[in-house]
Amino acid sequence: MNPAVVCTILSRLFFGAGLFLFFPVITALFYGEPFLPFCATMLVCFLLAFIAYKKGIPSVKDLNARECIAVISLTWLSVSFLYVLPYVFSGLLSPLDGLVESISGMTGTGATVFPDLRIVPKSLLLFRALTHWLGGLGIIVIFTALFPQFGKGSARMMDLESTSSSSARALPRIKETAKALFLVYLIFTAAATVVYICFGMTPFEALSHSLSTIPTGGFSPLNESIGAYDSPLLKMSVFFFMVISSANFSLYVLAWQRGFSVILQDTEFKVYLGLVGAAGLLIAANLSTAGILPLPEALTEAFFYAGSTSSTTGFSSSDYSVWPAFSQFILVILLLTGGCGGSTAGGLKVYRLILLVKSLYALLRQKLHPNEIFQVRMGKETFHAKELLHIFYYFFVYLGFIFLWTLLMTFTGLEIPDALGLSMTTMSNTGIIPTQIGSFPDLGQLPAGTKIIAACSMLMGRLECFTLLALCFPSFWRKTKW
């Protein structure tokens, strides 16, 4: 690994992270709020960019595997730490609480440490939403689209930062792919903002919520989240944008080239829609028969939460802690499943579960017919044993980390149900905590040790374990080539 190459890439990323702070600065000036916390953070970003640039090399032609892993890991860690500064400089949060809020924003988790958002300046609320937007599609993807290419290693870094069921790209060149994905991301955000305004939000609230919806983050500028609006049409519009943000974004690029039928033919997205639809109907029936809500309202709340949980956005519209256990457990299943590969959603991803089920089915058939060869397919793509084994590995590592975080959180004083619920929601980057911690989670009241564990869990879930785990191997730090 060449440290100079890593420094060169990091210098550009630090510079980009500083530029993003212009938006909250403009917001602070518009509303007459303090802007120095953002300016100071911007200067720190630019200073680090300059230092990294001086340590780097003039140009980067290619990156090897270790350099890509180092760039991804250091980018997410360093930007998360840099974006602690506005919270601390504003005097509203301690460094630890600021770190949890920053990581929750960057990873799209959406659980907050703020007990009351009414005391938070609008510029800082917008900054929270912007951290969602930057981390949602991926720091590398966005900066590859906006800034000069990083070399052939861009493709490797994008694969490490966001997962998909296929390595195939919508466009032949990685720069074109990043630009197309970013354009879709931008259009969806703008469309959501306009629709939210039409259904009753103020322009600021609409922008803040759209910056959280499309990256499936969940930060809201209001304490009551979407529940502050007594509008079924608004809730269903939020549901719509959460669902389309849970699909593989490459599908939308392909649909532009080949027609809308590409989306309807995608196996993973069809299964995802089936899961959301079935969950919504089951929860609505349960809420209605239990006398919790009348059927029309039960349908609205059920589908809203099915979309919010499966997309791992985590918006709330009511207190689901009073729901029957059956409905709450469906939410647990959805938050662990997550959205589609290549989307902004978290969780295990639907394609992995499809392939796990198909692999088990093929294994059972192999037992019945030992001489036959069975292939595992999803759509038109055939998956080989090595790819399927990697999915099995990830599945068990994912569950293993949930149990590990749960164990560590119980050591800090949490009860088992609360620790397990918090572990699941942070690993899946959901923000909804299906336990006694509450319907609107306030992480600020948790012990310091629990906050640190939760922050680690968020990062591990967002980068899907293996990228950060690679840093723990001694061979990663040796000078031999990988």
Show which residues each predicted segment covers.
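Membrane-proximal intracellular helices of multi-pass ion channels
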Residues: 1-482
